[in-house]
Amino acid sequence: MSDIIKILIVDDNPAIADTLADILEVKGFTVHAAASGAEALQILKEAPVDILLTDVKMPGMNGLELYRETRKLYPRLITIFMTAYSADELIQQGMAEGVKTILDKPLDMNFLVRLLSAYRRTIAEAGKMAAE
């Protein structure tokens, strides 16, 4: 079992996804990026991850719909919403359905790295690090 956290970033803005991926990789995380919910589901089939970090407002499948789909397939996957619209109804619904962490954009990268690192113990204790 690896102690490296595997993260899937989903954002329809490639600049945001790529920047996040670059920063998190430098910090020691394994990162995949997707530009849509559909692409994220495909990546998850091929490369299991520990944490899903997804934008909420995206064309096609939004972050809440992606959360619902991933929860069916991977019920223990940790999901973090990131949004510029923290009062949005999708955010409120996500929280009601079990999303525990909502991050406002623009993201505080130091806080994000600390948060993701804090999940390392939770993931390891649950014995659910993604398969290598």
List the model feature ranges, each with a label:
Residues 42, 64-76:
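Short amphipathic alpha-helix used as the core "switch/output" element in two-component signaling
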Residues 89, 107-117:
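C-terminal output helix
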Residues 18-26:
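Charged docking surfaces used in two-component/phosphorelay signaling
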Residues 47-53:
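Active-site beta3 strand of CheY-like receiver
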Residues 58:
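Receiver (REC) domain active-site loop signature in two-component systems and cognate sites
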Residues 28-35, 43:
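Short hydrophobic/Thr-rich beta-strand motif most characteristic of the beta2 strand and flanking loop
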Residues 35-39, 62-65:
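Acidic catalytic/metal-coordinating carboxylates
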